[in-house]
Curated annotation (Swiss-Prot):
Family: Belongs to the LuxS family.
Protein name per its UniProtKB record: S-ribosylhomocysteine lyase
NCBIfam families given in the database record: PRK02260.1-2
Name of the gene encoding the protein in the UniProt record: luxS
EC number: 4.4.1.21
An annotated Gene Ontology molecular function: S-ribosylhomocysteine lyase activity
Organism in which the protein naturally occurs: Tolumonas auensis (strain DSM 9187 / NBRC 110442 / TA 4)
SUPFAM superfamilies: LuxS/MPP-like metallohydrolase
Amino acid sequence: MPLLDSFTVDHTRMQAPAVRVAKQMRTPHGDPITVFDLRFCVPNQEILPERGIHTLEHLFAGFMRDHLNGSDVEIIDISPMGCRTGFYMCLIGTPDEARVAAAWSAAMEDVLKVVDQAKIPELNEYQCGTYQMHSLEEAHEIARAILAHGVGVNKNAELALPSDKLASL
């Protein structure tokens, strides 16, 4: 099985909350695609609660589009990581980490403005696979924690696992 890019970085040295360019590539027509690691929690030390991350998934994707999409950027998808320590964001364009961090912080402010669980988008059995597994309170706690800590930057060069270490794992 090929080694995926996300497993070539040292998770024991990741900071959170932090933005990291996880991958860059081009479409067959030459358009740039960037995948960002939006790390909410320090790996193997913290984990996002399932109801909170699910609610955040419904809110975060729209709010990030409000703050980041423009003439040079279009978000394709934002999805939670299986390890529940953050989200992956795939987009067309090459915004720098500072721009993504600012959009992320603004999106967290927007999450805090949602005060009624009934206002969570797509919160129904027709549009959500587990529509009863939500917690606006947990989403608010996550947003407050991000804003309290501020969003930093993780750099691949600083997190790269040496080839001898990768070979031994």
